[in-house]
């Protein structure tokens, strides 16, 4: 699937949601029903400390490696729509493209290491290595965890040196 120059043969559709926070996107992955849409909605509604947050796509995302970066874009048929449990599928402003800065993997809480190793905090997708955060699924603090991690990364930090003192609200 990889071509020379660090680009895939074309976009790959994957079951995920993506939100742009400031200048970088969060690719939210997880099993069906794990809370991807809920986390995306929470990040968009309360994006502090980021001044800007917008949906890229919900449920299905087109992902492509290009020049060592991972890019996400919406599937045309569902662009600008998000599923909000209890309300259904609703329209929402969206961005056409995001450079992914964090992989947020919704995971059962018991499967998340209490003290992650450095290798737990990085993952490779389509040949691009990225920071990875295991996020407890269906947890009310999930959005805060993602926002704090993204803020730390935006300031030039690495998840391996993340500190609670880094949190800015």
Language model: regions and residue ranges:
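N-terminal pre-Walker A segment at the start of P-loop NTPase domains
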Residues: 1-14
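Conserved nucleotide-sensing/catalytic segment adjacent to the nucleotide-binding pocket
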Residues: 49-106
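P-loop NTPase catalytic core of nucleic-acid-dependent motor ATPases
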Residues: 15-22
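Glycine-rich phosphate-binding P-loop
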Residues: 23-48
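Short acidic/polar mixed-charge low-complexity motifs
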Residues: 24-26, 78, 128
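Conserved NTP phosphate-binding and transfer environment spanning the P-loop NTPase/kinase superfamily
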Residues: 96-169
